[in-house]
UniProtKB/Swiss-Prot annotation:
GTP binds at D40, V41, V42, D59, E112, E135. Its EC number is 2.7.1.237. This is GTP-dependent dephospho-CoA kinase. The keyword Kinase applies. Pathway: Cofactor biosynthesis; coenzyme A biosynthesis. GO terms for molecular function: GTP binding; kinase activity. Catalyzes the GTP-dependent phosphorylation of the 3'-hydroxyl group of dephosphocoenzyme A to form coenzyme A (CoA). GO terms for biological process: coenzyme A biosynthetic process. The lineage of its organism: Archaea, Methanobacteriati, Methanobacteriota, Stenosarchaea group, Methanomicrobia. It catalyses: 3'-dephospho-CoA + GTP = GDP + CoA + H(+). It is an enzyme of class 2 (transferase). It comes from the Archaea. Keywords: Coenzyme A biosynthesis, GTP-binding, Kinase, Nucleotide-binding, Transferase.
Length: 161
C-alpha cells in the first residue's frame, strides 16, 4: 500500500490535464476512445449524457458528503477498500481486472481520488481519464508517455507501507 503523507498533499492541488467547466465541452475529446471517470459527479455526468465509461471509479461521496444522484450503473461492479490518501494493492488489482471487464465500475469503500495515478499505467496510450477538480470543473487527461512520467514522479512522494 502506498500512502501520501499529509505534507505532500499540496502536490495534488494542480490538475493533471486541461480543466473544462462543463461536461459537454469534453465530448469531442472522448468520442471513439477508451475513457475512464474518477469521481461520482464526473461518472454521473457521463452516464447522464448517455456515455458509458470503460471504467468508472466512485466512492459514493463528493466533497466528503454522500452523493445520491448516481443513475443506474452499467456493466460489472467491483468492490474494493482504499482508505483516504492511499493507493492500495487491492485498488490497483481491481483497476487491472476492470480493463478485462469493460464496462466496469470500481466501487471504493474509502476514497477514489488517487486512482488517477494507477490508471495512467493501466490504460493504453490514447485513453482518456476524466476526473473532477473541486471548485474548478472537470479535468481531462490523455494517457501518453508524458502523463505516465508525471504520475511516476508524483508516486515518489508516497510512502510504501
Amino acid at each position: 500500500m502506498l500512502t501520501l503523507p499529509p505534507e505532500n498533499r499540496w502536490l495534488f492541488r494542480e490538475p493533471f490535464g486541461t480543466v473544462f467547466s462543463d461536461f459537454s465541452m469534453v465530448l469531442p475529446y472522448i468520442e471513439g476512445k477508451i475513457f475512464c471517470t474518477v469521481g461520482d459527479v464526473v461518472t454521473h455526468n457521463a452516464l447522464s449524457a448517455g456515455l458509458i465509461p470503460s471504467i468508472g471509479v466512485i466512492d459514493g461521496f463528493t466533497k466528503r458528503s454522500p452523493y445520491l444522484k448516481m443513475p443506474e450503473i452499467q456493466g460489472h461492479i467491483l468492490h474494493v477498500t482504499n482508505p483516504a490518501g492511499t493507493i492500495t494493492d487491492e485498488l490497483i488489482a481491481a483497476l487491472r481486472l476492470a480493463m478485462d471487464e469493460i464496462p466496469c465500475v470500481v466501487m471504493v469503500n474509502g476514497e477514489e481520488d488517487l486512482a488517477v495515478l494507477p490508471l495512467t499505467e493501466i490504460l493504453p496510450d490514447g485513453a482518456v481519464i476524466l476526473y473532477g477538480q473541486p471548485e474548478e470543473g472537470l479535468v481531462i487527461c490523455e494517457v501518453n508517455k508524458q502523463l505516465r512520467a508525471n504520475a511516476k514522479k508524483l508516486l515518489t512522494y508516497f510512502v510504501s507501507l
